[in-house]
């Protein structure tokens, strides 16, 4: 296992933990997802269990997909490449999704600052960016070491 793959898996696990903590905070504080102002979540638990997510977490189906991709990334060969490519994509998607939430501006404003929400938001965004960057590095390493066929 390469160093970049180890770091990618660590970033993914960190992201999963951050999303779980984000879900707990969202349920406690009624933080509905409102990506770009057009999701308008109504029921946080239902939104989390389906495909909307919360203001501080991705939806459960996406987290389960991320968990599966993380496990795949640890496997050799084609399965591992699928896992790495998937985590790279998930990192890009989560970065855009989290930064598109209005809570980003509210949490970092003096009047709306909440330390727990700010930490979870930072962990989620930083780990998603890390997944994207480390996914690219790992993908390049895997491609360079793959035997050429043809």
Please give the residue ranges for each predicted region.
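Cytosolic juxtamembrane helix and N-cap/initiation of the first transmembrane helix
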Residues: 1-28, 137-143, 150
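Interfacial segments of alpha-helical transmembrane regions
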Residues: 3-17, 75-91
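Small-residue packing motifs within transmembrane alpha-helices
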Residues: 7-8, 62-64, 79-81, 87-88, ...
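Hydrophobic transmembrane helix segments
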Residues: 14-60
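Alpha-helical transmembrane segments of polytopic membrane proteins
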Residues: 46-66, 114-128
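Juxtamembrane helix-break-helix junctions at the cytosolic face
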Residues: 66-85, 139-142
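Hydrophobic alpha-helical transmembrane segments of integral membrane proteins
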Residues: 85-118
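Membrane-water interface at the C-terminal end of transmembrane alpha helices
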Residues: 122-146
